[in-house]
From Swiss-Prot:
Cofactor(s) this protein requires: [4Fe-4S] cluster
Organism annotation: Campylobacter jejuni subsp. jejuni serotype O:6 (strain 81116 / NCTC 11828)
UniProt keyword list: 4Fe-4S, Iron, Iron-sulfur, Isoprene biosynthesis, Metal-binding, Oxidoreductase
Binding positions (isopentenyl diphosphate): H36, H70, H120, S214, N216, S258
Pfam families according to UniProt: LYTB
Catalytic activity: isopentenyl diphosphate + 2 oxidized [2Fe-2S]-[ferredoxin] + H2O = (2E)-4-hydroxy-3-methylbut-2-enyl diphosphate + 2 reduced [2Fe-2S]-[ferredoxin] + 2 H(+); dimethylallyl diphosphate + 2 oxidized [2Fe-2S]-[ferredoxin] + H2O = (2E)-4-hydroxy-3-methylbut-2-enyl diphosphate + 2 reduced [2Fe-2S]-[ferredoxin] + 2 H(+)
Domain of life: Bacteria
Name of the molecule in the record: 4-hydroxy-3-methylbut-2-enyl diphosphate reductase
KW Protein biosynthesis (keyword) present: no
Record carries keyword Secreted: no
Pathway this chain belongs to: Isoprenoid biosynthesis; dimethylallyl diphosphate biosynthesis; dimethylallyl diphosphate from (2E)-4-hydroxy-3-methylbutenyl diphosphate: step 1/1; Isoprenoid biosynthesis; isopentenyl diphosphate biosynthesis via DXP pathway; isopentenyl diphosphate from 1-deoxy-D-xylulose 5-phosphate: step 6/6
Coiled coil: none
Cofactor binding notes: Binds 1 [4Fe-4S] cluster per subunit.
Family: Belongs to the IspH family.
Name of the coding gene: ispH
Length: 277
């Protein structure tokens, strides 16, 4: 059986930057998980004493706080700045961009449509920068019964599929006078999604490695599953089952943007140890 990695996969720029920052700072607390990968979060806690707190209210005697890659709300940031604590911002620059756009467009009188999951921490943070009105949607159908204003700005959660974003944009163009569209989908998302599509079309089994709470990993899995029925989403090599690979000729592997190479290599090694001819 051939084992092939996607052309683009794994750690993105923003995650690499955050991990490096956390390792250098040490002895700190992150507000929410730094990234969506439980194994890497455990490694940072064990080796660098970087612990995870659920929210700002959980801070007690910590001297250093790291803002997660997904960012935090504007209100939480203001609250954090009032505390006697050193702040290190690990928000991904691709996430900071829609925050800034929302703030500026609001000042100019635009209401904002955010294409994304309203429960995702990134989207909560982005929405908090809107001072007019924000509409968080996952489908154009959610906009059909809304009385839209004459001026709308549109941004996307960084990990969403571009074609779905364009469905929202095309709907709005037909419904309102002025639409300002900002492409806030991360470049790494484009590349990883294109790569897994290409690989899954020629594979008869696919393994996607990443946190099951990771939005970008779930998107990769959905693309793989569309093209390759026998696609599996795992967090570690412990979840692999030999029967997945029996009678298979081509195994494709990809990984989410928060998945470190050391986990991916363990997955490959275990699949190789199954010794599927």
């Amino acid at each position: 059986m051939i084992i092939e990695l996607a052309k683009n996969y794994g750690f993105c720029f923003g995650v690499k930057r955050a991990i490096k920052k956390a390792e250098q700072i040490k002895d700190a607390a992150t507000i929410g998980p730094l990234i969506h990968n439980n194994e890497e979060i455990s490694r940072l806690q064990k080796n660098f004493n970087v612990k995870t707190l659920e929210n700002i209210q959980a801070l007690s005697n910590e001297k250093k706080a790291i803002i997660r890659t997904h960012g935090i709300t504007k209100q939480d940031l203001e609250e954090l700045r009032k505390k006697d604590i050193e702040i290190f911002d690990a928000t991904c620059p691709f996430v900071t961009k829609p925050q800034q756009i929302c703030e500026q467009m609001s000042k100019e009188g635009y209401e904002v449509v955010i294409f994304g999951d309203e429960n995702h921490p990134e989207v909560k943070g982005v929405k908090s920068y809107v001072s007019t009105k924000a509409y968080v949607v996952l489908d154009k159908k959610e906009l059909q019964n809304i009385k839209l204003p004459n001026k709308i700005a549109v941004v996307s959660q960084t990990t969403k599929k571009p074609e779905h974003f364009m469905e929202i944009v095309n709907f709005l163009i037909l419904k309102t006078k002025e639409v300002r569209v900002f492409n806030t989908i991360c470049d790494a998302t484009f590349k990883n999604q294109d790569a897994i599509k290409e690989l899954s079309l020629k594979s008869d089994v696919m393994v996607v490695v990443g946190g099951k709470n990771s939005a970008n990993t779930k998107q990769l899995f959905l693309i793989a599953k569309t093209n390759c029925e026998d696609s599996y989403l795992i967090e570690t090599e412990e979840e692999l089952k030999k029967e997945w690979f029996l009678d298979k000729k081509h195994c494709g592997i990809s990984a989410g943007a928060s998945t470190p190479d050391w986990i991916i290599q363990k997955v490959i090694a275990k699949i190789e140890n199954f010794k599927i001819n």
